Amino acid sequence: MKIKLAFAVLLALCLSLSVMPVLAEQAATRADLARYYDDVTSLQGRFTQQTHDESGRILEESSGEFWIERPDRFRWNYAEPWPQEIVSDGERLWVYDQDLDQVTVRSLADSLGRGPATLLGGTLGELEEAFELTFPEPGRVALQPREATLDYEHVLLRLEDGVPVELELEDGLGQITVLRLEALERDVEIDPGRFEFQPPEGADVIEAGGGRTL
């Protein structure tokens, strides 16, 4: 009986010791994530984006530049293959499709968590409100939407040196979009005009949830 008890205690100790490094790694990744949202005031760089289906076939590739400034101000300029601008002034979100000469505008609060721009440009509180966070590997954060109304079913964020470098988003059709960030500069001064948007003259402007104005 004593031998069995000693073995059980030893096994429990071994299991607890094996779990401790994992918990430490999870805590470190969570701390890195919190520092990004709490301490990094701005981030800018270039990006590439690739979408492929569940079989791995590439459906779309794009690239461009981005600027993020807290709280909730950002601009993503897609240069290829179809020019597009996604701009937030902290209150409203503008999406301008140049080839369609069309602008869609909505409240930023209604858009949080719906795409890379709002995921990376928001706050940690907004992120935790929209997603359940887990930490499957060092430097990786898995985000599970709390509501089925969001555009993606699974999101995986990869951190490197305390900032996001890759975002993987899977939708309900099994399509996966991978966004990679490069040439990153953090805590730099960004021209406030980057986060302003004026619809081009003659563009079709659509108020999401409302009517259409010309």
UniProtKB/Swiss-Prot annotation:
Participates in the translocation of lipoproteins from the inner membrane to the outer membrane. Only forms a complex with a lipoprotein if the residue after the N-terminal Cys is not an aspartate (The Asp acts as a targeting signal to indicate that the lipoprotein should stay in the inner membrane). It is found in: Periplasm. It comes from the Bacteria. Its main location: periplasm. Keywords: Chaperone, Periplasm, Protein transport, Signal, Transport. Monomer. GO terms for cellular component: periplasmic space. The keyword Signal applies. The gene is lolA. Residues 1-24 form the signal peptide. This is Outer-membrane lipoprotein carrier protein. GO terms for biological process: lipoprotein localization to outer membrane; lipoprotein transport. HAMAP family: LolA. Gene3D superfamilies: Lipoprotein localisation LolA/LolB/LppX. Belongs to the LolA family.
